[in-house]
From Swiss-Prot:
The keyword rRNA-binding applies. PANTHER family: RIBOSOMAL PROTEIN L25/GLN-TRNA SYNTHETASE, ANTI-CODON-BINDING DOMAIN-CONTAINING PROTEIN (PTHR33284), RIBOSOMAL PROTEIN L25_GLN-TRNA SYNTHETASE, ANTI-CODON-BINDING DOMAIN-CONTAINING PROTEIN (PTHR33284:SF1). The lineage of its organism: Bacteria, Pseudomonadati, Pseudomonadota, Alphaproteobacteria, Hyphomicrobiales. Transmembrane segments: none annotated. This is Large ribosomal subunit protein bL25.
Length: 234
């Protein structure tokens, strides 16, 4: 069950740029609640509280009860906009969640076993292809993150989304099997591998002519050998 946070809000009686600027001057961030086949609901939330929620992380995967005039609206943030200069929130959108709602979310990817992977011990380096995973999940059980065990990966081996067991009711929305992480070989690794392969092949290559020479000498020796005397008749 996902943890539900509470966020207080007030209704916005007016809309438009002028009304939004007035809300910001009053220390509030304009926003809207939409979805679930209901009309949009213009709201505003306290600037300081919204900043703290965003800075806490996982804002876009956290379910909230927005309290408005004593009534709770179950929502999830879908987007927020920051001032391009001052970097503070200037607008926030919430998606209303109906009973049994299923939504698409982008969930952080956590890796474990980084230091114990054989590829790392051999000098390889992890290349994290994606830091998030796009999933479809029930609103009441959105995973806070997806954990992937990379402790068995060797150089040149990749971990894909299909290699991970997702929680019950959660599925990937990607069309392809997403590559999550690979182990990149160290500098000069390919040359070392080629040299090792060449070194292993050298004794076999040297033994081949000797074997051929031995095979050629055997018939010649047999030809030079004197013929056995014929058996005498009694």
């Amino acid at each position: 069950m996902a943890t539900v946070m509470e966020l207080k809000a007030t209704a916005r009686p007016k809309s438009g740029k002028g009304a939004a600027r007035a809300e910001r001057r009053a220390g509030r961030v304009p926003g809207v609640i939409y979805g679930d086949n209901q009309p949009p609901l213009p709201i505003s939330v306290e600037d300081k509280e919204l900043r703290l929620r965003i800075l806490a992380g996982r804002f876009l995967t956290t379910v909230f009860d927005v309290v408005l005039d004593g009534k709770k609206h179950r929502v999830i943030p879908r987007d927020y906009h920051l001032d391009p200069v001052k970097d503070f929130p200037i607008h926030v959108d919430f998606l209303r969640l109906g009973a049994g709602a299923t939504i698409r979310v982008s969930v952080p990817l956590h890796l474990k076993g980084l230091e114990s992977a054989p590829g790392v011990k051999r000098g390889g380096t992890f290349n994290i292809v994606t830091h998030t995973v796009d999933l479809e999940a029930p609103a009441e059980s959105i995973p806070q993150f997806i954990e992937a065990d990379v402790s068995t990966l060797d150089i040149g081996v990749s971990l894909h989304l299909s290699d991970i067991a997702l929680p019950n009711g959660v599925k990937s929305v990607s069309r392809e099997d997403v590559t999550l992480v690979t182990i990149v070989p160290p500098s000069g690794f390919n040359e070392e591998q080629k040299a090792a392969a060449a070194g292993a092949a050298a004794p076999a290559a040297a033994a081949a002519p000797a074997a051929k020479a031995g095979a050629a000498k055997a018939p010649a020796a047999a030809a030079k050998a004197p013929a056995a005397p014929a058996a005498k008749k009694k």
